[in-house]
Amino acid sequence: MRGEFYQQLTNDLETARAEGLFKEERIITSAQQADITVADGSHVINFCANNYLGLANHPDLIAAAKAGMDSHGFGMASVRFICGTQDSHKELEQKLAAFLGMEDAILYSSCFDANGGLFETLLGAEDAIISDALNHASIIDGVRLCKAKRYRYANNDMQELEARLKEAREAGAHHVLIATDGVFSMDGVIANLKGVCNLADKYDALVMVDDSHAVGFVGENGRGSHEYCDVMGRVDIITGTLGKALGGASGGYTAARKEVVEWLRQRSRPYLFSNSLAPAIVAASIKVLEMVEAGSELRDRLWANARQFREQMSAAGFTLAGADHAIIPVMLGDAVVAQKFARELQKEGIYVTGFFYPVVPKGQARIRTQMSAAHTPEQITRAVEAFTRIGKQLGVIA
């Protein structure tokens, strides 16, 4: 039986390769930035990182991280409730809460952990969760761990969300929570949070938003999709990451009212049984929030880059998904074409990744480009020119 198990895995891997669905990990030998070095020593322009504000290799963050290690050490060798809470952890939690307009915040090792430890902790069998169909895998997995009755609604479809809310209430649900991404990361679409909050008010439901692809750069002050949609103060729970716009390292958080956060500290298993966030990351994250609040220069540069890329790619004839976001998916349809396109682009010095099933539905393969404040206008033009040449070679555009 053991031999059969390993043979099955071997067969599945071979099938994935044959169908063009096998994901290869490419090696980077430099720091994460707009211009990176790959394993063969060549330099390429990176258009597939979550490095929205270009801070992943910023000297001020590196200095803050080093200072954090000098003052608070390398690691805590403990979970938070035993001997793993430093003053800097509390400072970061307070700053995150204030920045997001929430009462309190709690740190996790990742946003995956924040979502994984949220629903089961707060809701029981008599409750209901209504989740957007395109929510991140961490929300999906977190919901699966919860005993609450589960409902799903079509992406951003307020009519279907209302139908599910009616179902939950008619079934006698005690507490009802609507869970949605703030930005749907495969499409670059911002959630209709105003519609969600209006329905939540109508049906007395809670609202939870995973804002990993928004906090730091979406909204007038970069506070996230709830600021962009003008619903600050109407979202009950916000989860997010420190691993994208806010420095790009690792770490996650949940922000909510104090009683929610305090209960998570008592019962959320990923929080209780994971080591504390490293002092270097905590110190750098505090610095990031200071930089984001200091001005809009990085956000302005990011949005200018996103506009330039979208306009030039549309003019070249490409089909693009999303709108009003730094995620700009180039739709290709076929998984094999997406992978070949990405390989050819790397030969041209443009570093991207093809996304295909099971990450996206079959027939909706794409190259998800992501703009950064670190990109220059010249780098964006160079990328569009490379896309255009290869797109014509592969018959994607005329």
Language-model features: locations:
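Conserved PLP-anchoring active-site segment centered on the Schiff-base-forming lysine
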Residues: L118-A137
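PLP-dependent enzyme catalytic core of the Aspartate aminotransferase-like
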Residues: P59, A63-A67, S71, A98, ...
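Short loop-beta-helix segment that forms the pyridoxal 5′-phosphate
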Residues: V79-T85, E93-G117
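N-terminal "arm"/small-domain region of PLP-dependent enzymes with the aminotransferase-like
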Residues: L9-F74, A205
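Active-site C-terminal subdomain of aminotransferase-like
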Residues: Y203-L206, H213, V218-D324, V337
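Short, structured coil segments at secondary-structure junctions
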Residues: A125, L145-K147, Y203, R234
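Active-site phosphate-binding strand-loop segment of PLP-dependent enzymes
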Residues: N51, Y151, N155-V209
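Conserved PLP-binding catalytic core of the aspartate aminotransferase-like
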Residues: D300-F309, S314-G349, V359, G363-Q364, ...
